[in-house]
UniProtKB/Swiss-Prot annotation:
UniProt GO MF annotations: secondary active sulfate transmembrane transporter activity; sulfate transmembrane transporter activity
Protein name: Putative sulfate transporter YPR003C
Organism annotation: Saccharomyces cerevisiae (strain ATCC 204508 / S288c)
Segments for region (Disordered): 1-91
Residue intervals passing through the bilayer: 119-139, 147-167, 173-193, 200-220, 233-253, 283-303, 318-338, 371-391, 411-431, 451-471, 475-495, 518-538
Length: 754
């Protein structure tokens, strides 16, 4: 048979009996083609006989089995290669440790290149970040987490040292976070309500230790991909609800109603219940001096922030103005000068004992181990939120500063960091995008900026705690309110975006997460949001996306018939723009086949046979008979992988077609050897029609031999399969190839007859 290069000028052929040109390669060149060729060591000459792994789809002709003319060169090359490998083994082994060490300890990637200029930039950035992070840490600790102030300060001081060794994002600033502190605060309220003698430091220690352990094992197990599970809409819904909860809780302290709330016989736990409490009791029970002082601080912070935003348009350095630190310093001076606590009854932080912080905490003592069952759910929420928040920050910084960030390494760093700081009784610490961005804008060059922030925090803890004594509690609550408002600022923009884009599923996730958090609890909100997201992922992966193809009239192009017809109708154009081949159904599988979507493939194929489309409702009356289908072409160009369960389903589908005397053709099959080997072992390759291949190719999982001829079960193109169909019609062959039928398919078929 003579070779043909096209089908009516439109397609390539794969059944030429003329052998393609051969070429010679040295042994060194073999590795280049290791993904495309297998070799058989059991040949008669004990050499390496290469076997083509594709039917000319790679565009590389298979090499000649003969070694004439190049045997000596091959042997010499082998000897040279073996000698060089032997000599280089020692040097490679010696350098391996130094090459891989920066991957596991990222500090070794920047320490050798650290200079004085970078040091100066990190010092300035560390001072800038510490100026507002220390007041925030005190605010999170006292007004949100309800634990001693030193828990927050230790979290801010110690965590940067650990992250400086294991962290891989240079500008990342780690420390206590608002949402995390709120989860801890709700856990504290729940535990202390039933166990009055429990130490608040023990609660903080256990939550930090357990969450760190979860993160560490997740990183070791390489679960970093889970950072892609939760959608941005879910996180936005949760963070916005956290912002509202922070405002509600802070308002209680700003009106000095916290003690009155505790004294009531009924309990107000959920944010919605606290809103009802404020409506019922705030008008009559609020403390006037505290409310006035809180209002003044709130107005000052609002005005300074508005001024900063306007100035930043002209002077970017305005972002470094320490408005929060300025308000804290001024209120400390006012509190000291006018004796706010005794003269006006405004509560201050007051004296707090450092006795419980003079030694390291063991998270696994018996009293603390007993707290683990009660605090495990809160610890899991902390680990999840902390990881997602840190991942968001690291990805944003990585995009901005062209960094490659490994989620698994970040998990290990965050996990080990929290295990270490739990020994100090600290709050959980994670990365935050806002402060990390300010750190980068301040001139930070490495993680040493966070270390300097930690040093300044330690200095504050040892020298300036006497001034912390005078900070009014309501001022810290006002700072929390400002942070809560900032968490809500992006919500309107996100809602408008999803409404404009028709993202109603994202809006539903947002609403469910937000409402559940407000009306029930933070844990319930994040759990329901996660469950809904996972269900959506499963639904998405279980849906088959097969396409029915048709040729565009007057061209050699094939297109998705459903989309093409819909587009033609939408644009009021002539819908007679495609050509259907009589008795032939062309189906494209544009995705990997797995156990999740292979079952749906059966149903959609049945719908296509009955209606000519996969988008018509299955309850409608069939538009055509299944007997009209005589040929089915599967375009597997997008099927880059297939698991054994899906291969079994595909084999059953092909077997069912064979019983109806339908001819099956596979085209554009991936050159991936795993895909082809699995199709062969599942019996799929043996059950489909074949194209005549190179006579010199050996019988492998990709070829079959019959009467001296070699055949391949895979066609290069749809046109090649159509050409073969035309040849069969001319010959009058009406019996499809049926060499192989799986035992499982026979068993299932026969069992249905019993």
């Amino acid at each position: 048979m003579t070779s043909n290069n096209s089908l009516l000028g439109r397609g390539r052929m794969s059944y030429s009996s003329t052998a393609p040109p051969r070429f010679k390669r040295s042994v060194d060149q073999r590795d280049t083609f290791s993904d495309n060729f297998d070799y058989d060591k059991d040949s008669s000459n004990r050499g390496r006989t290469y076997i083509a792994a594709s039917n000319s789809t790679t565009g590389v002709p298979p090499p000649n089995n003969s070694r004439s003319g190049c045997t000596n060169n091959t042997n010499n090359t082998n000897n040279t290669s073996n000698t060089s490998n032997t000599n280089n083994n020692d040097s490679v082994d010696e350098n391996t440790v130094f090459e891989t060490l920066p991957y596991y300890l990222p500090c070794f990637s920047w320490l050798p290149e650290y200079t004085f200029n970078k040091l100066w930039g990190d010092v300035i950035a560390g001072i800038s970040v510490a100026s507002f992070q220390i007041p925030l840490a005190l605010s999170y600790t006292t007004s949100i987490a309800h634990v001693p102030p030193l828990c927050g300060l230790y979290s801010l001081a110690i965590s940067p040292f650990v992250y400086g060794i294991l962290g891989s994002v240079p500008q990342m600033i780690v420390g206590p976070e608002s949402a995390i502190s709120l989860v801890v605060g709700q856990a504290v309220e729940s535990i202390t309500l039933h166990k009055e003698n429990v130490s608040l430091i023990d609660i903080s220690t256990v939550i930090t230790f357990v969450s760190g352990t979860i993160l560490l094992f997740s990183g070791i197990s390489r679960f970093g991909f889970l950072g892609n599970v939760l959608s941005k809409a879910l996180l936005r819904g949760f963070i916005s609800s956290v912002g509202l909860v922070m405002i509600i809780n802070s308002l209680i302290s700003e009106l000095k109603l916290d003690k009155f709330l505790v004294s009531l016989p009924q309990h107000y736990h959920t944010p919605f219940e606290k809103i009802l409490f404020l409506i019922d009791y705030a008008p009559a029970q609020y403390h006037i001096p505290t409310a006035i002082f809180s209002g003044c601080c709130l107005i000052v912070l609002f005005l300074t922030r508005l001024l900063k935003r306007k100035l930043m348009k002209y002077h970017k350095s305005a972002i470094f103005f320490p408005d929060i630190l300025l308000v804290v310093i001024v209120t400390i001076l006012i509190s000291m000068k006018f004796n706010l606590k005794h003269r006006y009854g405004i509560s201050i932080i007051g004296d707090f004992s450092m006795d419980n912080f003079d030694e390291l905490k063991n998270p696994l003592t018996r009293p603390r181990r007993k707290l683990i069952p009660d605090l495990f759910s809160a610890s899991l929420i902390v680990a999840m939120l902390g990881f997602f928040e840190s991942t968001t920050a690291s990805k944003s910084l990585g995009t901005t500063y062209n960094l490659t960030v490994s989620s698994n390494r970040e998990l290990v760093a965050l996990g080990f960091m929290n295990i270490v700081i739990s020994l100090f009784g600290a709050l959980p610490a994670f990365g935050g995008y806002g402060r990390s961005k300010i750190n980068a804008l301040s001139g930070a060059q490495s993680v040493m900026s966070g270390v300097f922030m930690g040093v300044i925090t330690l200095i504050t803890m040892n020298l300036l705690l006497q001034f912390v004594h005078y900070i009014p509690n309501c001022v810290l609550s006002v700072i929390t309110t400002i942070i809560g408002i900032s968490l809500l600022e992006e919500v309107p923009g996100d809602i408008k975006f999803h409404l404009r884009c028709g993202g109603f599923s994202e809006l539903f996730v947002f609403a469910v997460t937000f409402c559940t958090t407000i009306f029930y609890s933070i844990e319930a909100g994040i759990c329901i949001g996660c469950v809904y997201s996972i269900i959506n992922i499963i639904k998405h992966s279980a849906k088959s996306r097969i396409q029915i193809l048709a040729r565009v009239a007057g061209t050699s192009n094939f297109t998705n018939l459903d989309d093409y017809m819909m587009n033609m109708k939408r644009n009021s154009l002539d819908v007679e723009g495609t050509e259907e081949i009589e008795g032939c159904m062309i189906v494209r599988i544009p995705e990997p086949l797995t156990f999740t979507n292979s079952e749906d493939l059966k149903q959609r194929l049945d719908r296509i046979e009955r209606y000519g489309s996969s988008k018509i409702h299955p309850g409608r009356k069939s538009l055509r008979s299944k007997d009209s289908i005589k040929y089915v072409i599967f375009d597997l160009g997008g099927m880059t992988s297939i698991d054994s369960s899906a291969a079994q389903v595909l084999e059953e589908i092909i077997t069912s077609y064979k019983r109806r005397n339908v001819f099956i053709y596979l085209v554009n099959v991936s050159i991936n050897d795993k895909v082809r080997r699995r199709l062969f072992k599942a019996g799929v390759a043996a059950s489909v029609e074949r194209a005549q291949a190179n006579n010199n190719e050996n019988n492998t999982s990709n070829t079959f031999s019959d009467a001296g001829e070699t055949y391949s079960p895979y066609f290069d193109s749809i046109d090649a399969a159509l050409y073969e169909i035309e040849k069969m019609k001319i010959k009058g062959n009406n019996v499809p190839n049926n060499d192989s039928e799986s035992f499982m398919s026979n068993t299932l078929f026969n069992s249905s007859l019993v």
